[in-house]
Amino acid sequence: MLLLIGGLYGLYYIDYQEEHKEPVKVDVLRLEQPEFLLSEAPDDYLMEALEYYNVKHKNIVYAQAILETGHFRSKVCKEYNNLFGLYNSYKKDYYKFDHWSESVVAYLNYIQYRYKPPDDYYQFLIKIGYAEDPQYVEKLKNIVKRYG
């Protein structure tokens, strides 16, 4: 039996051999990968990743990454690949990712899935309690003005 499996890094063909009942990798077809998946520098490719993953309000989300990481210099950014300060309240620690682009996907899954357009995105962030800083939205607006 031949099985086609799609993943983040391409398509894999798996041939199940009936007599052994275990998968044997037969052939790998790699799809063209976005350049940001190969980059270790989120500041150079974050906007491309936000577009690739169809993130809404990209400029605001980009500003969040700048603010949360101190311009991509924080420990949480460098050691955990966490661009948005995503926190695991059960483990009482920040989420750790193998690659910074995984934090973009996590942002979509944990934060942005709750957003309902056409609501104001800044108000949405306040409503969900994204940050404890009462000046958080004003800081984001200033960053958006500065970086566009």
What name fits each language-model region?
Residues 1-148:
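Catalytic cores of secreted/periplasmic lytic hydrolases that degrade extracellular macromolecules
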